A protein has these predicted regions:
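Extended redox/cofactor-interaction regions of prokaryotic respiratory oxidoreductases
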Residues: 179-245, 249-253, 258, 282-285, ...
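N-terminal export/assembly segments and adjacent metallocofactor-ligating motifs
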Residues: 2-294, 318, 323, 331, ...
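Short acidic (Asp/Glu) and glycine-rich catalytic loops that position anionic groups and cofactors
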Residues: 263-268, 314-320, 344-352, 444-447, ...
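N-terminal leader/propeptide and maturation segments of large enzyme subunits in energy/redox metabolism
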Residues: 118-145, 149, 159, 289, ...
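Short beta-alpha connecting loops at secondary-structure transitions
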Residues: 269-275, 500, 513-523
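Flexible glycine/proline-rich, aromatic-decorated loop/lid segments
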Residues: 261-264, 483-517
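Active-site phosphate/pyrophosphate-binding segments
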Residues: 287, 307-429
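Long, contiguous, secondary-structure-rich segments that constitute the structural scaffold
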Residues: 530-592, 710-728, 732-818
């Protein structure tokens, strides 16, 4: 704990409740930057601990006030750029004047910490039958009993050469390295994370074009912001987004949002363009047609830094605005005007997220949108899509022993590498659960470890997921609530909140920044922190590295045997920090202002022009104008750079050609998960589920600042903001159907039906209905239970065939009175 002695003025700034409105969209808590000086010390004292939030994946910096061991308030960390801006000059020059912010979820974390419905002790299932509505007949057991039973099951798999039959599912931002280390040392290739439920289609789209999977929007310096299916002013991926977009608009930018639903972001845009779900790629191709037809593209950038432009130009020759209008319902004149405005306004930025991505055609649609940035030279320049210099802690890879290596050679159960040419390392949840339910796949898994994941509510295809979990011999869930997924478990062990544990957070800004998550209070039920739980399992199983290193006992800094698991983990983190960009220990990070490491390098632009060192170039293999690194045996390995006109060797983009790629002939050599060749071009094809006479409406879902996925609906403070999720129906559509506000209706697809409450709006495409994702719990807690509607039963458990992205937004329904 860090004790600060503050002036009265600073105390009021930091500890007072200051609620402001960012862009008029959602309530954010803001505080002015506080600089503590020895000369300002007075008798006013308070204890603050700097940390990082984990109420969502944004990982905002937080400052927690603790009194007598109890958390009483959460404020934004005034030192963390993630709470302010993704551009370094903006942060350094303006944060002290404006102050930082956190979203409602971050401010409400205290309610989750002290939720009366939290799990307190391990539970063991007494009823072997599993399913929705089945009473598990829980029996409370001790931690020792839980460890013994879980270890016995794990040991049985490993001793029988079946370690690969363990499936491990983890949340993305919490103690992931120790979990993946455990899986590798145990011998299972089946470590998976949440990402493939979120934005892996976007990742694949941008990687195919620019070579990296997460460029960041520089809205602050842009003059034209074009967003496809993204709601950053409310579904705040990072808490700095509302501010930089607002400041960009104040600085003269026009914002245009393409979305079937009038989201908070669309509401604040100068123009909202409603579109048929899953047709965004067609609109992007038509825009490309106009930009090329009118010669509005950046000729120099395309000549020097792209490949395949001619083939793309030929492909979009007939992709006219009139062609796209028939597909999207967006008027041809609107498409033409937006294309011209976008290309003519410098600098401009275009971005796409989960709205278009979570369809069967999401990757190619996103790729068509990403190419719009290339057409206008909007890559890694101020006001465009930036390549983040994302450096932080370094994961120190472990070396598994001979026993583990045997089973690590088995295929992943989800067949990530074999089936999904642009799959993400997070795995393919939908493939795994579909095969598990149907008895397919390369082998039959026997056990699952599910950490901080409510899979029953978050994976599409509820009935499939239910059957899949029931088909496993043994399921362990580690969570803070008795969730719907926990009800399918054989043993449930209570976890901790982010306010009770450590983590390192490499922040998604454009220059290197790393924030520390550290315990604000001790685990309130005396339960082990998740990394202690994993460490204890590793110790009981006797897992070691190939050289015999007793890795779960030996400290990574001291090399000495450490019994205290928290101290052991502190050395684990220190080693990652020392080997990574910060080059410091955990204690040194704690001592920095706000417990956040902020690189002085700042945001850099046009990094594709960075020179390759003469030494690196001399040790490379040149083929044509591309430099390749060497394998240990001297053979050609990966491309590392590009020889440009004049003979200079530069980094280029991280694609095979080291240029932005409109076209890649090698894609045709790959097949997607459905057995089809991958098109070298960003082709448009209709999504594979369309409305018909029986199910005439598109159903979509979205997220808002009020809740995170399916995990915050028991948070009393957030439920005050958003208690449920009515079905939003266009007023014209509702009139035709005879529906009014607050009517109870059935929403039915070919897979099932759910009951919902109607809310009429003009802000919805008339062929579309939709609701906020995350509600409709039958477990989790007293507040969450029976509030709102879940739509997971309405969709199949299905993944996009290129990236493995779960298809959350592709659904056709009929709506009728209940």
């Amino acid at each position: 704990m860090k004790t600060k002695t503050l002036t009265r003025k600073e105390f009021l700034k930091l500890a007072g409740v200051a609620v402001g409105t960012v862009s008029g969209v959602a309530k954010f808590v803001s505080t002015a930057q506080a600089k503590i000086k020895e000369s300002e010390l007075t008798q006013v004292k308070s204890d603050f601990i700097y940390s990082c939030c984990n109420m969502c994946g944004g990982q905002s910096g937080i400052m927690c006030r603790v009194v007598n061991g109890k958390l009483v308030k959460i404020d934004p960390n005034p030192y963390n750029p993630n709470n302010f801006s993704n551009i370094s000059t903006d942060f350094f020059e303006n944060v002290e004047k404006e102050g930082t912010c956190i979203c409602p979820k971050g401010n409400a974390g205290i309610s989750t910490l002290y939720d009366k419905d939290r799990l307190q002790k391990p539970l063991k299932r007494a009823n072997p039958k599993k399913g929705i509505g089945v009473d598990p007949r829980w029996k409370e057991i001790s931690w020792e009993e839980a460890y013994v039973e879980i270890t016995k099951r794990l040991k049985g798999l490993r001793d029988n050469g079946e370690a690969h039959k363990l499936l491990w599912f983890s949340e993305d931002h919490s103690f992931t390295h120790i979990q993946s280390d455990f899986c590798k040392l145990f011998g299972t290739p089946n470590y998976s994370m949440h990402s493939n439920l979120c934005d892996t289609a976007r990742k694949a789209s941008f990687k195919m074009v620019m070579g990296l999977d997460r460029p960041l929007m520089d809205a602050l310096q842009s003059k034209y912001i074009l967003l496809f299916g993204w709601n950053p002013l409310s579904a705040t991926k990072w808490s700095h987004l509302p501010r930089i977009i607002t400041r960009g608009i104040e600085n003269g930018a026009k914002m245009v949002v393409v979305d079937p639903y009038l989201s908070y972001t669309a509401n604040k845009a100068q123009e909202w363009i409603p579109i048929i779900p899953g047709t965004d790629g067609a609109m992007a191709l038509a825009m490309g047609h106009v930009i090329i037809r009118d010669k509005l593209y950046d000729e120099i950038f395309i000549k020097d830094w792209t490949i395949g432009f001619e083939k793309y130009a030929e492909y979009v020759k007939d992709k006219t605005p009139q062609w796209a209008e028939k597909i999207t319902t967006v008027p041809a004149k609107t498409i033409e005007r937006i294309a011209i405005e976008f290309a003519a306004t410098k600098p401009q930025v275009v971005d796409v997220w989960s709205g278009p991505g979570q369809h069967s055609n999401g990757v190619q649609g996103g790729r068509a949108i990403a190419i719009l940035a290339a057409l206008v030279g909007g890559c890694d320049r101020p006001g465009t899509l930036l390549i983040p210099d994302n450096k932080g802690n370094k994961h120190i890879e472990v070396e598994p022993d001979e026993i583990a290596n045997k089973t690590l050679k088995e295929k992943r159960f989800d067949q990530l590498k074999e089936l999904y040419p642009f799959g993400h390392k997070s795995g393919i949840y939908c493939q795994a659960f579909s095969d598990l339910a149907e008895g397919k796949g390369p082998y039959k898994p026997k056990m699952a470890m599910i950490v901080f994941q409510n899979i029953m509510m978050s994976v599409p295809g509820l009935k499939t997921v239910e059957k899949a979990l029931a088909n496993l011999e043994f399921v362990v869930v580690n969570d803070i609530f008795l969730s719907e997924t926990a009800l399918m478990a054989d043993i449930v062990v209570p976890g901790t909140t982010y306010l009770e544990r450590y983590d390192l957070n490499t922040h998604w800004v454009t220059w290197p920044v790393l924030g520390l998550r550290q315990p604000v209070v001790k685990p309130i039920f005396g339960q082990p922190v998740e990394y202690e739980f994993v460490t204890e399992l590793g110790r009981r199983l006797g897992l070691k590295e190939a050289d015999g290193n007793d890795i779960f006992w030996v400290g990574r800094m001291s090399g000495e045997r450490i019994a205290d698991k928290t101290k052991w983990y502190e050395e684990f983190l220190s080693k990652e920090l020392k080997e990574g960009a910060p080059k410091m220990t955990l204690e040194e990070l704690k001592a920095l202002p706000g417990a956040v490491w902020v690189s002085k390098s700042g945001t850099r632009y046009e990094k594709y022009k960075d020179a390759i060192s003469p030494e690196k170039l001399a040790d490379s293999i040149l083929e044509g104008n591309i430099a390749y690194s060497k394998k240990p045996d001297g053979a050609k390995d990966k491309p590392i750079g590009l020889i440009i006109e004049g003979g200079a060797a530069v980094h280029g983009f991280s694609t095979p050609s080291r240029k932005v790629e409109f076209y890649n002939a090698d894609f045709a050599k790959k097949k997607d998960a459905w057995g089809r060749p991958v098109d070298p071009l960003p082709v448009y094809e209709p999504r594979d589920w369309q409305p018909d006479a029986n199910y005439p409406l598109y159903l979509i879902n979205w997220k808002e600042a009020s809740h995170t996925h399916t995990r915050t609906q028991n948070n009393a403070l957030l439920v005050e903001l958003k208690p449920d999720n009515p079905l939003m129906v266009n007023v014209v559509t509702a009139e035709k159907m005879g529906l009014n506000n607050d009517d109870l209706v059935w929403v039915e697809s070919i897979y099932g039906r759910v009951k919902a409450k109607v809310k009429l709006t003009k802000g919805m495409h008339p062929e579309v209905v939709g609701l906020q994702h995350g509600f409709g719990h039958w477990a989790l807690g007293e507040i969450a239970k029976d509030a709102g509607t879940s739509d997971t039963v309405l969709r199949p458990c299905k993944a996009d065939p290129l990236s493995g992205q779960a298809i959350h937004k592709q659904c056709c329904v009929k709506v009728y009175k209940a």
